Amino acid sequence: MVPWLGPDDPFPPIERALGPATGAPGLLAASADLLPSRLIDAYLRGIFPWYSDGQPVLWWSPDPRMILVPAEFKVSPSLRKTLKRVLREPEWEVRVDHDFPGVMRACAQAPRRGQRGTWITAEIIDAYTSLYRSGNAHSIETWHDGRRVGGLYGVSFGRMFFGESMYADATDASKIALATLVAHLREQGLEMIDCQQNTSHLASLGGREIARKAFVAHVRSAVAEPPIPWQFDKRVLAALTGRAEAAAPSGIER
């Protein structure tokens, strides 16, 4: 039985999330509200909302958890070529927090294979825009010839980044945004990006699963650290474009 949370009810222990033998593995709780205070509390505990229009707010903590370690990001030869072009050609820009609501709306409208509709509802956009205004949500945006052609958004507390969604209106535009984010996080020494759930696309870029217990332990430590700066641009990509580029090994378990 999934517990229903009233406005003042705390989240149950994450170990009570539904298991793999159920129809909704990782489902922890449901509620009627998506208040910013509830959303912040969720992220600090390694919990995230995911639901569709017409459903209550559903809160998840899957086991295992999909992550991307910046030091393990895979740059294919074709992506490296693209990143070099982005660095070389002035019509390409990567902007941070220039149009956060616009990126969210674009992610909501992006077609997803095997998915009808979107989980990025108006309520979700309002809640995450509130986090953006408080400095805890960010967008990384790929621009070409003055037009936004791709990007991603996510949540950040301390030295932890929680990826939410990405979109592309031009080839590799979302990968350019992700690579720029990864390069910045590597530069800052950040060890983990939360990717929530396993997809073949994320796996192709170096994403992998870890046990929920290890994920939550890392989150608790990382969110207690001072926040990292969020001013950067495409120049950080230079660290990813060399043939022998490498980052220090991470301490994240395999």
From Swiss-Prot:
GO MF entries: leucyl-tRNA--protein transferase activity
Gene3D superfamilies tied to this protein: Leucyl/phenylalanyl-tRNA-protein transferase, C-terminal domain, Leucyl/phenylalanyl-tRNA-protein transferase, N-terminal domain
Principal location class: cytoplasm
UniProt xrefs under InterPro entries: Acyl_CoA_acyltransferase (IPR016181), Leu/Phe-tRNA_Trfase (IPR004616), Leu/Phe-tRNA_Trfase_C (IPR042203), Leu/Phe-tRNA_Trfase_N (IPR042221)
Claim: Transferase is one of the keywords in the record: yes
SUPFAM superfamilies in alphabetical order: Acyl-CoA N-acyltransferases (Nat)
Keyword annotations from UniProtKB, A to Z: Acyltransferase, Cytoplasm, Transferase
Subcellular location: Cytoplasm
Gene Ontology BP annotations: protein catabolic process
Reactions that this protein is recorded to catalyse: N-terminal L-lysyl-[protein] + L-leucyl-tRNA(Leu) = N-terminal L-leucyl-L-lysyl-[protein] + tRNA(Leu) + H(+); N-terminal L-arginyl-[protein] + L-leucyl-tRNA(Leu) = N-terminal L-leucyl-L-arginyl-[protein] + tRNA(Leu) + H(+); L-phenylalanyl-tRNA(Phe) + an N-terminal L-alpha-aminoacyl-[protein] = an N-terminal L-phenylalanyl-L-alpha-aminoacyl-[protein] + tRNA(Phe)
Highest taxon of source: Bacteria
Gene Ontology CC: cytoplasm
First-level EC class: transferase
Entry EC no(s): 2.3.2.6
Keyword Mitochondrion recorded: no
Primary role: Functions in the N-end rule pathway of protein degradation where it conjugates Leu, Phe and, less efficiently, Met from aminoacyl-tRNAs to the N-termini of proteins containing an N-terminal arginine or lysine.
Stated family: Belongs to the L/F-transferase family.
PANTHER family documented for this protein: LEUCYL/PHENYLALANYL-TRNA--PROTEIN TRANSFERASE (PTHR30098), LEUCYL_PHENYLALANYL-TRNA--PROTEIN TRANSFERASE (PTHR30098:SF2)
HAMAP family named in the record: Leu_Phe_trans
Record-given protein name: Leucyl/phenylalanyl-tRNA--protein transferase
Organism this protein belongs to: Burkholderia lata (strain ATCC 17760 / DSM 23089 / LMG 22485 / NCIMB 9086 / R18194 / 383)
